[in-house]
């Protein structure tokens, strides 16, 4: 989103070490980090410090933009996502389905009826073409296995059956500045992921996998493959699908998250989208990202009942326990998505009577909102705190909620991968800030406390 002319200008820097002054251009309230490389110390002879120039230290990349994007912004009036310039409210008004949102986010245009139908059919065809080896690999896992290793194994099995999909094996670049190949690969990746999730869901439930139908939409096929159908009609509940579509708009992307960053880093070496997806999902499964939902469920289960919430919150305040789903790096105050998420729970008639753990979550929310420890720090429930209950209301089992979430986020993943394939490629090569010794005698005995030090005792 272009900013006003006030966001353009120059940054004047005076280096107190040398008394030199520098001008650094400001464009759209952003400066180019590489411009700081010209700020260095005068030295004689060879100098690594001079060669590198001034570095920017930004642990966690809290204030670093890694690329320009046209995919997602924020609606200043609501704080909700602005997807390719289209408001969330407009997309909800249109009852936007997966195909339409995928086209908007990945290809950059809202599809016509003909384009939507062609994309719907292409998704279904790719779903039906997934080789049997994918299911065979997934079924080698015990049904009780966590989803992540099953997902990565299933996606890897697909890659092994289609080596021409992989640029390095193909002999070089396939997708960069090749929009037709990139579009087809993005569509195929989303279809393959849906099949993998369906196979995993059925394997864990011990039910037969029902393949995709070319007459149905992406979401209808997803729910069918996952076994989330009415026993009488063998079709998904249309009301549940309608609420799921609303969730797509808020959950399909959330800007440069940690998983999107990892995906873009992988894409910068010109990897195929399935390899990029594997890296993003693996990164996201940590308890500080998407893994927070599964960790949150297990925490609620451990608390056990609402009357034990005060004791749990005291443990949190003593930093003995972690409260997942509270606070957000993007939203400093109230998460603007939260009201929508709570509304979907009401639409699905899902409350603490249907799910006892929700009573514990509501008690945490109620007490934390009255506790100065949380309020003074601006810590409030974010959308993820209640999103796990929404996915439970959709019908997904607790341990599949993170994996099911990626069925929405895959739109954003593919949008960022597709955008990277259009832009100039610069392979990610960050720097680190070395603070270790300048020289060290390797023969000198270490005083460390690691496993090798313990072995010497």
Swiss-Prot record:
MF annotations from Gene Ontology: citrate (Si)-synthase activity
Active site: 328, 384
Record EC number: 2.3.3.-
Reaction equation(s) it catalyzes: (2E,10E)-dode-2,10-dicenoyl-CoA + oxaloacetate + H2O = (4E,11E)-2-hydroxytrideca-4,11-dien-1,2,3-tricarboxylate + CoA + H(+)
Superkingdom: Eukaryota
CC per GO annotation: mitochondrial matrix
Biotechnology section: Phomoidrides A and B (also known as CP-225,917 and CP-263,114) are potent inhibitors of Ras farnesyltransferase and squalene synthase. CP-225,917 and CP-263,114 inhibit Ras farnesyl transferase from rat brain with IC(50) values of 6 uM and 20 uoM, respectively. CP-225,917 inhibits squalene synthase with an IC(50) value of 43 uM and CP-263,114 with an IC(50) of 160 uM.
UniProt KW Transferase keyword: yes
GO BP terms, alphabetized: carbohydrate metabolic process; tricarboxylic acid cycle
InterPro entries (UniProt xref): Citrate_synth-like_lrg_a-sub, Citrate_synth-like_sm_a-sub, Citrate_synthase, Citrate_synthase_sf
Top-level EC class as recorded in UniProt: transferase
Gene3D superfamilies for this protein: Citrate Synthase, domain 1 (1.10.580.10), Cytochrome P450-Terp, domain 2 (1.10.230.10)
Induction notes from the record: expression is induced under low pH conditions.
Keyword Transferase attributed: yes
Involved pathway(s): Secondary metabolite biosynthesis
Record keywords: Transferase
Record-linked PANTHER family: CITRATE SYNTHASE, CITRATE SYNTHASE, PEROXISOMAL
Family assignment from sequence similarity: Belongs to the citrate synthase family.
Function comment: Alkylcitrate synthase; part of the gene cluster that mediates the biosynthesis of the antihypercholesterolemic agents phomoidrides which are dimeric anhydrides. Within the pathway, the alkylcitrate synthase (ACS) phiJ and the alkylcitrate dehydratase (ACDH) phiI produce the decarboxylated monomeric anhydrides by coupling the C12-fatty acyl product from phiA with oxalacetic acid. The pathway begins with the highly reducing polyketide synthase phiA that catalyzes the formation of a C12-fatty acyl-ACP, starting from one acetate and 5 malonate units.
UniProt protein name: Alkylcitrate synthase phiJ
Lineage of source species: Eukaryota, Fungi
The gene coding this protein: phiJ
